[in-house]
């Protein structure tokens, strides 16, 4: 995994923009940072280089004692979300330093990580894109069933990983090589091409690819 810097933000929603040739480009608008550096880890002390950043300010009354002791060291208040980014070098970062959206540039490719929308308990046709059984010609009450899920006496079990009905969504998803369309540093806004995981106001992590 590339050791690159990133930021935290939230998904504001989707819209569209028009390219120079007149084509319509669907985009997602993200509110990103600014994120203060809450901790700097060094190879000498912790065994690896990394920085920890904070996002989404919290009032002091909502922070427990251990979290308060940790976050007070940066002198930037308290935050709901903390994320760590392993880096090759931390020489350019110091405790309390604010990292803003201007570390990104239009045309750059990034990775976006979020929590996908929860869909609840779903069948195999929705969850795994199964074709289902026949609509008629002898098919009865099995139109959306998965069909066979294994063998007979041998091996006498259903193998692990078999695609079956179950909980769908509400899991960590990363989408790579998303192109940045626009960076609005004065508004802390990042406009990226296409869609990103999660609902409106959902937490997202944006990382550089190199």
From Swiss-Prot:
Quaternary organization: Part of the 50S ribosomal subunit. Forms a cluster with proteins L14 and L19.
Region listing for Disordered, in residue ranges: 139-165
Originating organism: Maridesulfovibrio salexigens (strain ATCC 14822 / DSM 2638 / NCIMB 8403 / VKM B-1763) (Desulfovibrio salexigens)
Disulfide bridge map: none
Keywords, in A-Z order: Ribonucleoprotein, Ribosomal protein, RNA-binding, rRNA-binding
Protein family (similarity comment): Belongs to the universal ribosomal protein uL3 family.
Keyword Magnesium assigned: no
Keyword hit for RNA-binding: yes
GO function term, MF aspect, one: structural constituent of ribosome
SUPFAM superfamilies per the UniProt record, alphabetical: Translation proteins (SSF50447)
GO cellular component: cytosolic large ribosomal subunit
InterPro entries named in the record: Ribosomal_uL3, Ribosomal_uL3_bac/org-type, Transl_B-barrel_sf
Function statement: One of the primary rRNA binding proteins, it binds directly near the 3'-end of the 23S rRNA, where it nucleates assembly of the 50S subunit.
GO biological process: translation
Name this polypeptide is given: Large ribosomal subunit protein uL3
Pfam families cross-referenced by the UniProt entry: Ribosomal_L3
């Amino acid at each position: 995994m590339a050791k690159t810097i990133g930021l935290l933000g939230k998904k504001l929603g989707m819209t569209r923009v028009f390219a120079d040739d007149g084509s319509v480009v669907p985009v997602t608008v993200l509110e990103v940072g600014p994120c203060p550096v809450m901790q700097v880890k060094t190879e000498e002390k912790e065994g690896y280089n990394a920085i920890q950043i904070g996002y989404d300010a919290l009032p002091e009354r909502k922070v427990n004692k251990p979290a308060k002791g940790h976050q007070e060291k940066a002198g930037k208040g308290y935050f709901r979300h903390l994320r760590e980014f392993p880096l090759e070098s931390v020489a350019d970062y110091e405790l309390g330093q604010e990292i803003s959206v201007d570390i990104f540039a239009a045309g750059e490719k990034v990775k976006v990580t979020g929590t996908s929308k929860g869909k609840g308990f779903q069948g195999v046709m929705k969850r795994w894109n199964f074709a289902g059984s026949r609509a008629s010609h002898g098919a009865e009450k099995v139109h959306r069933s998965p069909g066979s899920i294994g063998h007979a006496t041998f091996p006498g079990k259903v193998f692990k990983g078999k695609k079956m009905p179950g909980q769908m969504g509400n899991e960590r998803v990363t989408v790579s090589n998303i192109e940045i369309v626009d960076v609005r540093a004065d508004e802390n806004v990042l406009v990226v091409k296409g869609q990103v995981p999660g609902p409106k106001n959902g937490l997202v992590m944006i990382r550089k690819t190199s």
